[in-house]
């Protein structure tokens, strides 16, 4: 059986579609609980959710952040498997059955990711590698976008088409199917990360303890992408950069952390703004400046 954790924040109809994909067809028979953690949403998303014996809703009085909200859900998970699922994701007809079958047949990994299709049905990049300081330079300078096979991206494996199954460093938290028992080995998400990088940090700790993550190209789900944070672009960039620096400070040497900090503050904003100017996207330049102002104010 599977416990499913969904963190909601102003997800509108996305949340309803997500829940409907779980309780329809062949998926519901494998579900123990659907745990929805709401981070003080101001929209109507929760009011759309039907009453169902397997649905548990926890409403936070303030936005606790993604990591903390996930942990609230993880604490309630007692089934053999736990699925962390984004509210802007949807299961296909046999997704849960196929995940359980894959876990039990291969029986050599702790975390499973699947092919995530966007709204147009195209495969999206959903796996990442553990980053290194030099790869952050490749990203900050734009080299990884120009020639990703030569200058390997720091995180997202854009140099791989995701059309084959393989072991990976990390699968995206939008769909993260896990052995519930791993929480006893390595704990939950690190709540220092308000949002972003929490699943990367989790996967790194898993790997350090002998665990593995696996990507199955044969199992599919839908992920619209961006969720509600795509509507707050400056804040989204700020939170991403903030979590990047937290991750670097936690996992890199002092020199490595300082190098990532230099790339983040001095190289990346120039690269971003030059590319935006070349595209004539001047509105986005404002978002970049706002994000860095927030980063400086928060003493990253």
Locations of the language-model features?
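N-proximal low-complexity "stem/linker" segments adjacent to membrane-targeting elements
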Residues: 1-24
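A conserved acidic beta->alpha catalytic loop
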Residues: 21, 38-46, 62
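Glycine-rich, basic loop-to-helix element that forms the pyrophosphate-binding segment
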Residues: 59-77, 98
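Short aromatic/hydrophobic "clamp" motif used to bind/position activated sugar donors
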Residues: 82
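Conserved donor NDP-sugar-binding/catalytic core segment of glycosyltransferases
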Residues: 92-127
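Short, flexible, basic/aromatic active-site loop/helix in glycosyltransferases
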Residues: 131-168
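A short, conserved alpha-helix in the catalytic core of glycosyltransferases
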Residues: 161-164, 169-220
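Non-catalytic, C-terminal membrane-associated alpha-helical segments of glycosyltransferases
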Residues: 235-243, 254-300
